[in-house]
């Protein structure tokens, strides 16, 4: 089997075909939300709204800006740590996110915002589409450097579809609370990506080992991504919460958890090195685990000290995962996790689901007040049998559903991506920008071996 990485026809045709389909589907199904439509003046009068500043745009757009930066800048630059894969890390993240948000607007729209035959599109839809793509960016981290852009587009197509179905099951059928997406975004995205990379296992990947590492400047670029993600994560976890106390509380809980996570990550990184030195991999990734783990319970009455405890624990677990678990997964289970998403998103996502279930199960009127409890968990007159323990049970069920959807979906998509005609690189040519990008002349001399697009992997 020839390893032909020439994408001259495959990539343009795939991009153009997908975009034409998006144009047609948007033309048929998508219309503006009343808050974005030119009839807003009449809508405002009908709803007795006195000012344009009460438009939903002004409540949600600041959070949308922050989330948007996280998806395109934060995730993109976080993955630039590979010394010869910076163009692809940022560029392919840009590509899959740009396609993913369009398909997510349609998939989530059909499931959540379909009225009178149309999807009504407002600023909250844009935030939710970014959330969906965030899950794809998480999965991208597992296969980084080992797949072609065509494979990434196909993976995005299927993952967005599966994400939207999983999200509908959790939020609409099980009615779980998951403001920051610990279960829907991080757990689903991580275990979907890990399953895909398990199916795409490369036995000769050691031949690219010298490129599967960082250099001084690539780690600095990755740290830029870390800082953007760390600063904006409170917006991420609070972006779609109810206005008022819930959104305020979600930002505070995330802020506290992230802060605690940094100190424990630094402590463990130093303690686990025989000379007490820090590892940039831990500082770039484990310091963010607190934001992941507090996501489900972000808008609940977790209390600031509870958020600090969550961040404290996740900093330890994530750092230990990078040191001990990632090598074990690769050597024993054949899971080649390029970015260590299991440590940043997988395990913290599961912890977040558990924390959310426990916090929901312990909710009471003393903590929330009668009206506050009803508002926090959307209890109305139809939910006469609702109890906190029941909510906790549904929260736990949501975690298992996310895991099941991720594993089954990852198996199916992994098999599809394993087909030989997607333009994937040979094992010895992984983690190399020159395969798919025109690179500066002064960098071409650094390529350690021939990048023949028909090159086959060397037999062991």
Curated annotation (Swiss-Prot):
Domain of life where this protein originates: Eukaryota
Keyword Amino-acid biosynthesis: no
GO molecular function: ammonium channel activity; ankyrin binding; carbon dioxide transmembrane transporter activity
Gene symbol of the encoding locus: RHCG
Glycosylation sites: 48
Protein name per the record: Ammonium transporter Rh type C
Keyword Transmembrane: yes
Family named by the database record: Belongs to the ammonium transporter (TC 2.A.49) family. Rh subfamily.
Main subcellular localisation: membrane
GO cellular component: apical plasma membrane; basolateral plasma membrane; cytoplasmic vesicle; plasma membrane
Location within or outside the cell: Cell membrane; Apical cell membrane
Pfam families named among the record's database cross-references: Ammonium_transp (PF00909)
Function: Ammonium transporter involved in the maintenance of acid-base homeostasis. Transports ammonium and its related derivative methylammonium across the plasma membrane of epithelial cells likely contributing to renal transepithelial ammonia transport and ammonia metabolism. Postulated to primarily mediate an electroneutral bidirectional transport of NH3 ammonia species according to a mechanism that implies interaction of an NH4(+) ion with acidic residues of the pore entry followed by dissociation of NH4(+) into NH3 and H(+).
Biological classification of the source: Eukaryota, Metazoa, Chordata, Craniata, Vertebrata
Modification after translation (UniProt): N-glycosylated.
Record's keyword terms, sorted: Ammonia transport, Cell membrane, Glycoprotein, Membrane, Transmembrane, Transmembrane helix, Transport
